A protein has these predicted regions:
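Primarily the internal scaffold of c-type cytochrome electron-transfer domains
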Residues: 2-184, 188-200, 205-209, 223-244
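Conserved glycine-centered beta->alpha loop in an early N-terminal alpha/beta scaffold
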Residues: 216
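Extracellular Ig-like/FN3 beta-sandwich strand-entry sites
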Residues: 211-213
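Beta-strand-rich extracellular modules
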Residues: 219-221
Length: 244
């Protein structure tokens, strides 16, 4: 309604529609009450749809376009948003038309497990007297995770003795903090722990016993804080059991 690159207006009508075709394709100044398709399609829709600036209209609120501008697998690799989130597929553009190669409109992202698993590499091992977990942002053109502050990547390490008794538990959370997580009267900018594109975060946990077992898990949280066992909001991506 405000145009590509402009801050969206708060909408008071048709809230039940959510995002529609017009959210991205609408062009300022066009009277769609007279739209009949056909030749109108050439002029009725914004030609900049699908550009990074188009996506940034809404997604810049979470800093994702800024992250992309410095990302090893993003702008620096010549990739744009639609390369990952609107891949080319063969499908009919409209009912009754023959399939052809066009952009997918399913927008795979953090709710899509296959897309999520392409984003990272995970390694867990016992090195000397500590557990070392490495999480690498191997394929994302922005931070991992990004978008809403609710998103989180969590590494959990549990150390047990030879009898299975829990000795230690450590959790590393990669996220951008909520305002409620800042220090009282904090006047400095918050510092996130999201993993930048192409970078690795380490989670190190010391071992204080001679032998036992380490349990390592990697969770993705669609909304944090949520329980690791929440079937809707949490997904266990990796699980390792390492004797030492």
């Amino acid at each position: 309604e405000t145009g590509i690159g402009m801050t969206p207006m708060q909408r008071w009508t048709d809230l039940e529609e959510g995002n529609t075709c017009m959210s991205c394709h609408g062009r300022a100044g066009v009277d769609y009450t007279t739209f009949v398709g056909g030749a109108d399609c050439k002029t009725a829709f914004d030609p900049d749809v699908g550009t990074v600036s188009s996506c940034a209209t809404c997604h810049r609120i979470a800093g994702t376009p800024d992250q992309w501008s410095r990302a090893e697998h993003g702008k620096l690799a010549g990739r744009v948003c639609i390369d990952c989130h609107m891949p080319l597929v063969e499908r009919p553009v409209a009912v009754g038309t023959a399939p052809r190669l066009v952009r997918s409109h399913t927008f795979p992202a953090s709710s899509n497990e296959a897309q999520l698993r392409r984003a990272y590499a995970y390694d867990a091992q016992v090195t000397g007297n500590e557990v070392v977990v490495r999480i690498t942002n191997k394929g994302v053109g922005h931070n991992f995770p990004t978008a809403n502050r609710q998103r989180g990547v969590e590494s959990l390490v549990v150390v047990r003795d030879r009898d299975g008794k829990e000795i230690a538990r450590s959790r590393l959370v990669c996220r951008y903090p909520y305002a409620s997580e800042l220090a009282p009267h904090q006047m400095t900018l918050p510092r996130g722990s999201q993993i930048p594109s192409g970078k690795t975060t380490e989670h190190r946990v010391p071992l204080t016993i001679a032998d036992g077992t380490v349990e390592c898990r990697l969770y993705f949280k669609l909304y944090r804080p949520s329980a690791d066992t929440d079937a809707d909001l949490a997904r266990c991506l990796e699980e390792r059991r390492i004797p030492f």
